[in-house]
Amino acid sequence: MKRITITLSLVCVSLLFIHCKEQTTTTTPDETAQVVSNLAKVPDSWVAERVAKAQAKFQASKAGQIVWQAMEAHGGLANWYKNGPLGFHFDYKPLDGSVQRNSYQIIDTWSSKARHQAFEDRSKEYGWDGQQAWVTTKDTAYFKYNTRFWALTPYFFIAQPFVLDGGGTNLELIGKREHAEKTYDAIKVTFDPGTGDAPDDYYVLYFEENTHQLGVIRYIVSYPGYFEKGKHLPEKLMELQGITTVNGIALSTGYHTHWLTEDEKAGEHITTITIDNIAFKPDTEKAYFTIPENASVIEGL
């Protein structure tokens, strides 16, 4: 009897050990994502919650429905966030010989943070940590343009229409527009006071009525670092020059920028933009977007 009791006890202990081992090694994908908290990429459950709120907001108006349709046509807002940070090379070339802006960059699409590296020398960097702009201290005079303004500017072009999920955004359907023998639904985007550095900016986005994809971006620049309040550059019109699909997301590969004429047509061609090396970077750590020790905070606009 004693021998049987000992044997049964050993069996029970073995079963308990196996059960505990199974319990400690079984995790859901979201739990795993929570554990790997050093990554900028967020858990899928966070994405699902944010996307559900966004869909409800966009479905509440005709303009919003068109934007949501466009997001779906470009691969879907959920897929956009699930892919994690986005990296690309953005080369902005004015045709009048003024300053070129040419950098590699990685963007935290969830939190709108950015880190740029100069095309000619990738040790020269600047960025936006979500609160402050910065530049590597030894290179404050290297960049011949306003790096605070430029930290997120390329992102707000390539990430259309997904960036319209941000707060403080207002949408207005302004009707149909014709461009290059295609018909588009035109949506005007404005911003609440206090939204970003330039809340007086606006965009007019053209979404092709059949494919629902973006074809044209019209915009103004009212950045206070360049202009007194209430003033801005004349409106510009950007034509998308191509689209590539990366991890299921349709993104532009370049733009031609024109002055907008009085009859809302493309006027003088003033800038050529090319975008390449486009790839999502899901392994990027949160710390990548913090201000480096060898950098200085940019004061003012």
Positions of predicted regions on the chain:
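Bacterial N-terminal signal peptides that target proteins for export
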Residues: M1-L8
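Short, solvent-exposed coil/turn segments at beta-strand boundaries
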Residues: Q34-V36, Y81-P85, Y104-H116, Y126-W134, ...
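Gly/Pro-enriched, hydrophobic low-complexity segments
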Residues: Y184-F289
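Post-signal peptide N-terminal segment of mature Sec-exported envelope proteins
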Residues: T27-K57
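Flexible, processing/modification-adjacent segments and terminal tails
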Residues: F58-A63, G127-D201, G225-K231, L301
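N-terminal mature ectodomain segment of secretory-pathway/periplasmic proteins
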Residues: E49-A52, A56-F58, K62-A141, E172-L173
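C-terminal motif of bacterial Sec signal peptides marking the signal peptidase cleavage site
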Residues: L16-H19
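Bacterial signal peptide processing site
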Residues: K21-Q23
